[in-house]
Amino acid sequence: MPLDVKICGLSTRATCDAALAAGADMVGLVFFSASPRHVDLGTAADLARAAQGRASVVALTVDADDAQLAAIVETVRPDLLQLHGRESPARVAEIKRRFALPVMKALPIATRDDLAALPDYAAVADRILFDARAPKGATRPGGLGVAFDWTLLRDLELTLPFMVSGGLTLDNVADALRITRAGGVDISSGVESAPGVKDPELIRAFIRAARATERLSV
């Protein structure tokens, strides 16, 4: 199965164009004011139009209410909703039903115990994103450049598509894919020159590294 590469936290047309030209399968737009990657609806709509027909547009929210989600869906018209907060399985199911869009639920991972919630989320989400659990005191749940122990997913039995995130770089993406056998990778801080500032060359280099791993696995 082809590998999905997602570049998350894009906030400018230049970096979005760089990700698209490099072959990103998904572009992630962040709607969370505590993040340096947060975009307003107007900017997000412009980036989504640029990506239309070239990559899937993913709207990342954190414990968003229906009003915020409705505004995003109406204005940006994303292909996928990424729920990156503490949304319960019931809330995930409700959002999926209300907005009639596929949903990817992020699960924070630090120890094997964190996988206990997986079956309940897998029953309602369309895709799972395994991300590193944020350190204590962090003001946002992801995009922190922190990795988790990928071997926790080594014997994972999951029929649902899943991606890995957290601390990925062009130097470790091959190991992450080899160990987890994930169907996709999601990167944000690993392709930045500063928090929230995407680097087009790092984007290109990461996608090349991920694609090289994909070719080796064929």
Curated annotation (Swiss-Prot):
Highest taxon of the lineage: Bacteria
The processes (GO biological process) annotated in the record are: L-tryptophan biosynthetic process
> According to the UniProt entry, what is the EC number of this protein?
5.3.1.24
Could you cite one Gene Ontology molecular function of this protein? phosphoribosylanthranilate isomerase activity
Q: Any idea which UniProt keywords this protein has?
A: Amino-acid biosynthesis, Aromatic amino acid biosynthesis, Isomerase, Tryptophan biosynthesis
Q: In which pathway does it act?
A: Amino-acid biosynthesis; L-tryptophan biosynthesis; L-tryptophan from chorismate: step 3/5
Pfam families (alphabetical): PRAI (PF00697)
Q: Which reaction does it catalyse?
A: N-(5-phospho-beta-D-ribosyl)anthranilate = 1-(2-carboxyphenylamino)-1-deoxy-D-ribulose 5-phosphate
Coiled-coil zones: none
- Answer whether the UniProt record assigns the keyword Isomerase to this protein: yes
Q: Which HAMAP family does the entry mention?
A: PRAI (MF_00135)
Query: Of which family is this protein a member?
Result: Belongs to the TrpF family.
The record's annotation in NCBIfam families points to: PRK01222.1-1
- Supply the PANTHER family for this chain: N-(5'-PHOSPHORIBOSYL)ANTHRANILATE ISOMERASE (PTHR42894:SF1)
- Per its record, how is this protein called by name? N-(5'-phosphoribosyl)anthranilate isomerase
Annotated organism of origin: Rhodopseudomonas palustris (strain BisA53)
Organism lineage string = Bacteria, Pseudomonadati, Pseudomonadota, Alphaproteobacteria, Hyphomicrobiales
